[in-house]
Amino acid sequence: DEAHCISQWGQDFRPSYLKILEFLKKLPYRPVLTAYTATATAEVRDDIMDILNLRDPFVLTTGFDRENLYYAVKRPRDKYRELLSYLKEKEEKMPGSSGIIYCLSRKNVEEVCYQLREDGFSVTRYHAGLSDEERKENQEDFIYDRKKIMIATNAFGMGIDKSNVRFVLHYNMPQSMENYYQEAGRAGRDGESAECILYYSPQDVRVNQFLLDTKENMGDFTEEELQNIRIQDRQRLRKMTQYCTTKKCLRKYILNYFGEQTAEKCKACSNCSEEYEKTDVYPIAADILGCVKEAGQRYGINMIVGILAGAD
């Protein structure tokens, strides 16, 4: 399972997975081998087959389109205020809804969990800094609906199959489309409508870039291998950032990323469902450029702004 971990092109390459090959070679005969993953691009799928030396394999791709999921990207000035407003509205419309809020760091998890608890929400938390016992208890509280909202890092989710999750909200931008798709995909597994909302800010890009640049060498990689992995990580981060800033259909972006095609508009994402007002800005732009040209280099930007605004 999680076969993408065997590929250096995958978003979560683990050198320990390469030991599978050593194990297979020691067996008296080669058994039938199956490899499963929910988040592999065509490139990664080919790499998995090559590394495992799969002979004429039967490849089954079930598709990446989850039609019951609504995708949205928001750029709030105050993320917590936006989150609080969303949860209050959700509670009014669908009381007791279960949801997951993913945060980039343990600190974010602790802060958001504390604030939501203070605001009266049924919440629990999950990250690698908690003891095994507390993580297990918190996970079971969420799975069995003793707590309605889980606030967690990406440490939460492996093997979790809670069917009635009505929303997955990312408080920070993840590092890759693979991570986002996997985490957002924990919503709506009962087939009913669910929402996948991402709160984006440019600061998320800088933080993720820092985390990638300072990531420790956990796999005894050579410097060349480590450099190649970092290049792949940066490319994935760019694709994730493009998802957060595109004006095109979000569902189409996700499916195209994983090598699938779809209609131009899905009408089930924030970009397709929002109506934009078209405005001819040519006259305004012409006034600005004309003023700058007339002023030459005699005045600074504040003076130019003042002139355009009609200041004395």
Where are the predicted features?
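Short, charged low-complexity linear segments at domain edges
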Residues: 228-258
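Helicase motor core with emphasis on the C-terminal RecA-like subdomain
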Residues: 2-224, 235, 259-262, 271
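Short helix-to-turn junction characteristic of helix-turn-helix DNA-binding domains
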Residues: 87, 142, 244, 292-296
